[in-house]
């Protein structure tokens, strides 16, 4: 159940990435230039994902992206988006608020998963090490 919820969070981040890019393109339709920022959703390992902002550069060699440093916590600092102009900046801030919530929920989910796995291991060890006697072997006077 915990892993299913985590998968849903990752899928939501991917949907937000795609939706953001489409909305950003719509804002740029009458303007010269390109969308200078995007959302990247990566899966560094089987049980994790990361949603972060990237700066997009266009050069003679083609397109390149650079990760924007978030620092600690779940939210990007306001100054991280100083290169983005309005009205795109407003869209970025709105999406960042939602992405920060997703990052926090994902982190809490992984912490809960880790705790549940540790508890499962502990209970499994204790059950396998315990020497339970059959209730039939308990003397009558000891049953309460």
Task: Name each region found by the language model.
Residues 1-144:
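Conserved glycine(s) in the ABC-transporter nucleotide-binding domain "signature"
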């Amino acid at each position: 159940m915990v892993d299913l919820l985590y998968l849903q969070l990752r899928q939501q981040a991917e949907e937000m990435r795609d939706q953001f890019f489409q909305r950003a393109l719509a804002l740029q339709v009458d303007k010269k230039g390109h969308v200078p920022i995007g959302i990247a959703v990566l899966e560094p390992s089987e049980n994790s994902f990361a949603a972060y902002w990237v700066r997009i550069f266009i050069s003679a060699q083609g397109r390149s992206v650079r990760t924007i440093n978030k620092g600690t916590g779940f939210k990007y600092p306001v100054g991280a988006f100083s290169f983005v102009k309005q009205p795109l900046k407003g869209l970025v801030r709105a999406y960042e608020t939602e992405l920060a919530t997703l990052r926090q929920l994902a982190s809490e989910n992984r912490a809960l998963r880790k705790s549940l796995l540790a508890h499962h291991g502990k209970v499994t060890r204790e059950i396998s090490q315990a020497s339970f006697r059959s209730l039939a072997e308990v003397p009558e006077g000891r049953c309460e």
